[in-house]
Curated annotation (Swiss-Prot):
It is found in: Cytoplasm. It comes from the Eukaryota. Keywords: Acetylation, Cytoplasm, Phosphoprotein, Repeat, Ribonucleoprotein, Ribosomal protein, RNA-binding. The lineage of its organism: Eukaryota, Metazoa, Chordata, Craniata, Vertebrata. The modification Phosphotyrosine is found at Y99. This is Large ribosomal subunit protein uL30. The gene is RPL7. One of its GO terms (biological process) is maturation of LSU-rRNA from tricistronic rRNA transcript (SSU-rRNA, 5.8S rRNA, LSU-rRNA). Signal peptide: none annotated. It comes from Oryctolagus cuniculus. Pfam families: Ribosomal_L30 (PF00327), Ribosomal_L30_N (PF08079). PROSITE patterns: RIBOSOMAL_L30. The modification N6-acetyllysine is found at K84.
Length: 208
């Protein structure tokens, strides 16, 4: 009976989130349309969420860069993590910019990363998220009891983002299909490093 009730609750939550995401998308489109009509530019809200991928090794790098990569939990090449964007984290990303590719993940990317490559940190071990009970056991006290809750908390950068993000083990991504262009050159100069804004979603597809 308890399991049935839990399943129903999870289903209701998923339905609610789906509606919320649709609403967010519609609002964005409406605002852009209104701005265009009034002859203005629509400036979207500042992104709150980044996905950061380490794209280079760190032989011979300064201790400062090494330390920041550790703080971002990017200990190996092609590791990826979610980062809440604020002044402090943006400064950290600037310090390690030549070693990372980052940008603003969309809902599809967050969804696919967590469903396909999501591992939780349970008793300091890397455990595949095959069951909602694993999530409920670790994050239930924050009302995060299933995959959909976890995705919602990360994507919307909710008030328990830190706990949800720390629960997620850094993502181990594959080497990108088609390879990298130039790891040492910034994205805006035709390379791979640095902020590629929405284009990060393309890179995630190639690595997931």
């Amino acid at each position: 009976m308890l399991r049935k009730a839990r399943r129903k609750l999870i289903y209701e939550k998923a339905k609610h989130y789906h509606k919320e995401y649709r609403q967010m998308y519609r609002t964005e489109i409406r605002m852009a349309r209104m701005a265009r009509k009034a002859g203005n530019f629509y400036v979207p809200a500042e992104p709150k969420l980044a996905f950061v991928i380490r794209i280079r090794g760190i032989n011979g790098v300064s201790p400062k860069v090494r330390k920041v990569l550790q703080l971002l939990r990017l200990r190996q090449i092609f590791n990826g993590t979610f980062v809440k964007l604020n002044k402090a984290s943006i400064n950290m990303l600037r310090i390690v910019e030549p070693y990372i590719a980052w940008g603003y993940p969309n809902l599809k990317s967050v969804n696919e990363l967590i469903y396909k490559r999501g591992y939780g940190k349970i008793n300091k071990k890397r455990i595949a998220l095959t069951d909602n009970t694993l999530i409920a056991r670790s994050l239930g006290k924050y009302n995060i009891i299933c995959m959909e809750d976890l995705i919602h908390e990360i994507y919307t950068v909710g008030k328990h983002f830190k706990e949800a993000n720390n629960f997620l083990w850094p993502f181990k991504l594959s080497s990108p299909r088609g390879g990298m262009k130039k790891k040492t050159t910034h994205f805006v100069e035709g390379g791979d490093a640095g902020n590629r804004e929405d284009q990060i979603n393309r890179l995630i597809r190639r690595m997931n």
